[in-house]
């Protein structure tokens, strides 16, 4: 049902009662999911322009200049609510939707990333959600031939009733091949192509704009779309061929609000209106009414703007791929959105009012009762080795091999660096590669939304830096609870400010994304952790070898870059020892941009064998991860005057470990930023000492701990 306040505004504008179908249009297009009515004022604070930005926010995907005439299409979406109600189909159709956003811009999809957030795997329900969501992503992505090359998986009890499925997609085309969702000319036809239209996904946009009820799995299942990846693959090839032949003037994927949303937004973006004949839509089920035809979110569908003289050729092309195609309307000079069904006009609305008239507001923002519990930090553990192994065996740090082995991450033969390292790398040309990273730090963001949001950018930028890449663009997915609660809106507001400031300091534009609110569970009486997840892309030159994330050469000097601080709030170490709300979140250092630039220069010099970002689990987790094939001797005595657990497990931002056989040259590159030689790659064990501790771990002990998640899932 439409909120009463919205209904009053609509009645005043129309001068009458809206029809049932019109109410459905407003319910979906004015939903939080479609209109960003709560977050729009905040999103405007992002810097979205840059020298490489061709198309920024507002289209199905952003377009970023890459190299040698190539451009990248990039977008990020969530499919959170559907993935709780029906995890396999919810996750699968999340992949399908973002891929269609990419092809609607004229680009071929070449990569996916999947930041995922789950409750702990200690209940049958959470285990079911985890397994089915991974299967859904693998089942859809593998079938359409798009590799999942990077991702993040994070576990916390506050995601138990509301897992998060975020997806980043990247596509590639020539700049002259770009198509937009901006309508071109009145009189052009609207062709609906792809799968037939059923009742699945009906009301999906409005469903995604409210909290999950205890009965959501039964009541909301019809709102979850059902995907067919084999049809999607045909849609990809058909759409790109139609664009190559010059038949498509503008194009939009059918996602939230179905045909109604796509056709109205496409027309409005070009300053035109549209007339839709609902009867003309190819229907999967008998006796569908106008409401269902217009607003169902059946998957694998596109709407094309086609010149009248090209309609027959387009329909023939659609038929060649054994897909459904029909002329369902046309563009009009009059900026109205009208829908006809069985000879009766059931929708007649000013199109700008429908697509852009949702009232936006900056909600009340109040800081919550402080989350930090002073004095609750865990004591220094008596057995540091046991603590070390406990932290690196945490599922948030441990290898995600069980997940990414289910993905075909080498399809299309572009993958240079496979999943499991700091960033994915794809070959675009013989000389240039695309570097990708994604993720978030939810626990830190809960305690300090500003610094948490800022550090999301810094950490992901460092993931690119250790491969020698600087950032080209950022997309985001802002996952939060109910914004009507002042403390939740405060989290959202400050996370956005931190994320925006971090991106500006690194001169990386924020070019698009998604807002997913109302992520709360009636069943568990919880809101998710504030989760401003991002995807970031960069460019790397293949003229010098890319550093590995793992120690590669015995005898290499190990260099710590950046400053290690005592603040441990939001860290994985604190979480492992039941101190979730203790401590202060480390601030991003003012010289973070300079540190990242220095790491990029070092990686590009060709003098690094290995390089690894430090984040969750700190130096301990970083060393353990790098010791995959070789041991190391490390001395932290001179790093700083910190306790043993602070030295080992601090997650202070803007830090990295580098390994090189030419330390003098690398130290010269790092001379203007904090750095220190802390050890050497050697032996078959990891030996770490400080002023008052020594730890020795065999490579087998490290491997067993680091493979904890894979061993648990394979048991």
From Swiss-Prot:
Pathway: Purine metabolism; IMP biosynthesis via de novo pathway; 5-amino-1-(5-phospho-D-ribosyl)imidazole from N(2)-formyl-N(1)-(5-phospho-D-ribosyl)glycinamide: step 1/2. It catalyses: N(2)-formyl-N(1)-(5-phospho-beta-D-ribosyl)glycinamide + L-glutamine + ATP + H2O = 2-formamido-N(1)-(5-O-phospho-beta-D-ribosyl)acetamidine + L-glutamate + ADP + phosphate + H(+). Pfam families: AIRS, AIRS_C, FGAR-AT_linker. Coiled coil: none annotated. Its EC number is 6.3.5.3. The active site is at 33, 79 (proton acceptor). One of its GO terms (cellular component) is cytoplasm. One of its GO terms (biological process) is 'de novo' IMP biosynthetic process. GO terms for molecular function: ATP binding; magnesium ion binding; phosphoribosylformylglycinamidine synthase activity. Substrate binds at residues 78-81, 100, 225, 297-299, 516. ATP binds at residues 36, 476, 513. Mg(2+) 2 binds at residues 101, 253. It is an enzyme of class 6 (ligase). Mg(2+) 1 binds at residues 77, 514. InterPro entries: PRibForGlyAmidine_synth_PurL (IPR010074), PurL_linker (IPR041609), PurM-like_C_dom (IPR010918), PurM-like_C_sf (IPR036676), PurM-like_N (IPR016188), PurM-like_N_sf (IPR036921). The keyword Hydrolase does not apply. Monomer. Part of the FGAM synthase complex composed of 1 PurL, 1 PurQ and 2 PurS subunits. Belongs to the FGAMS family. PANTHER family: PHOSPHORIBOSYLFORMYLGLYCINAMIDINE SYNTHASE SUBUNIT PURL (PTHR43555:SF1). This is Phosphoribosylformylglycinamidine synthase subunit PurL.
